[in-house]
UniProtKB/Swiss-Prot annotation:
InterPro entries: AP2_assoc_SerThr_kinase, BMP2K_C. It comes from the Eukaryota. The keyword Phosphoprotein applies. Residues 32-41 have a biased composition (Low complexity). This is Uncharacterized protein FLJ45252 homolog. Residues 1-74, 87-115, 182-208, 235-298 are annotated as: Disordered. Keywords: Acetylation, Phosphoprotein. The modification N6-acetyllysine is found at K19. Residues 182-199 have a biased composition (Polar residues). The keyword NAD does not apply.
């Protein structure tokens, strides 16, 4: 159909038949190059091809008729191609815009997407992370945590009892404890005065306490004065007791000291069932390494009294009896037998100077 009275195909290159032939010829030339079998070249062109490419005065190759036709038809083809590309690009841009619109819809805020839905609950609203737009009535999930957040700390919680005050270290004393300590410090001088006034009875009780374990350690049956003991042994004990510091009639506290106070437990022990049995230390001599049968023969020897001071504070006397012959026999045996003579090293007395 013509436009503005022009013929349908004014130009032979615009005809569809010639157009297809020209395109086929250009494609074959582009692939195979000029050859002798081509129907578009004459014998003269074949001769010139064999001789070499002939150049014009400008240095460029002269154009052939087929190439001129191709150049005439090429602008139209380019226009048609551009139009087709434009139409295709227009068609393609619409889906791209639609795709971009879909992508933009994906990046919408969560709350806006939730509002666009038909009343469906937003699953991300209950997620542990928070969105950028948090509603005002949102519940703080950290308020139920075991730790206390800084913003929700109440002033009443800051006044809690200090847990370190109950610990054994760095204990803080309250006012009541401080007053109690002051009261106890005031009572100390009063107790000191009372202790000074009662020094005599306290010392007497201390002597009794010291004498009691001594009495338990050494039974009174062994130290009781028996009928076999001479009278001068008891007199020596009384004389030694009279010369002791305890013999003063008045103590430091002003109380009189009873001389027979330490002898009262002895008198009580005299009335025991073992008071009638005499004590013979010679019976224990057989367990000694210096035992000899001569000790049994000298059992009739006269015993003497021996004294032992238990402590410096009470000056109590404990009497015992040992035989004189046993002591003499022991000393003579020890003097005659030298224990160092049997030692592996020689003694100094045994060495003779050359």
């Amino acid at each position: 159909m013509g436009t503005k009275g022009l013929p349908l195909y004014p130009d032979p290159c615009r005809a569809p038949g010639t157009k297809t032939q020209n395109t086929l010829a250009s494609d074959s030339l582009a692939r195979e190059g000029p050859s002798s079998n081509s129907s578009f070249h004459s014998s003269e062109e074949e001769g010139t091809d064999l001789e070499g490419d002939m150049l014009d005065c400008s240095g460029s190759r002269p154009l052939l008729e087929s190439e001129e036709e191709d150049e005439n038809c090429r602008p139209l083809q380019e226009k048609l191609g551009e139009a087709a590309l434009f139409s295709e690009s227009g068609v393609c841009t619409e889906p791209e815009e639609r795709g971009q619109g879909g992508k933009k819809s994906q990046f919408l805020p969560i709350n806006q997407r939730a509002s666009d839905d038909l009343g469906e609950p937003d699953v991300f609203a209950t997620a542990p992370f928070r969105s950028s737009l948090v509603p005002a009535d949102d519940v703080d999930i950290f308020s139920k945590a075991p730790f206390v957040s800084k913003g929700s700390v109440a002033p009443s919680q800051m006044d809690e009892v200090d847990v370190f005050s109950r610990a054994p270290f760095t204990k803080k004393r309250s006012m009541e404890e401080f007053l109690a300590v002051q009261g106890s410090s005031q009572d100390l001088p009063m107790q000191a005065n009372l202790s000074q006034s009662n020094e005599g009875p306290l010392l007497a009780g201390r002597d009794r306490a010291i004498y009691t374990p001594a009495q338990a350690q050494y039974p009174m049956t062994g130290f009781a004065p028996q009928a076999g003991l001479p009278s001068h042994s008891v007199q020596v004990a009384d004389h030694f007791d009279g010369n002791s510091p305890r013999g003063s009639p008045m103590s430091s506290g002003g109380h009189p000291v009873d001389r027979n106070r330490g002898l009262q437990p002895q008198k009580e022990a005299f009335s025991g069932p073992a008071a009638g049995k005499p004590f013979h230390p010679q019976a224990l001599s057989k367990y000694s390494r210096h035992y000899s049968p001569e000790d049994e023969l000298s059992a009739e020897a006269q015993p003497i009294a021996a004294y032992k001071i238990v402590s410096q504070s009470n000056k109590q006397l404990l009497a015992g009896s040992v035989s004189v012959t046993s002591l003499s026999s022991r000393t003579t045996e020890l003097a005659t037998a030298d224990p160092f003579a049997l030692a592996p090293f020689p003694s100094k007395a045994g060495k003779q100077k050359p």
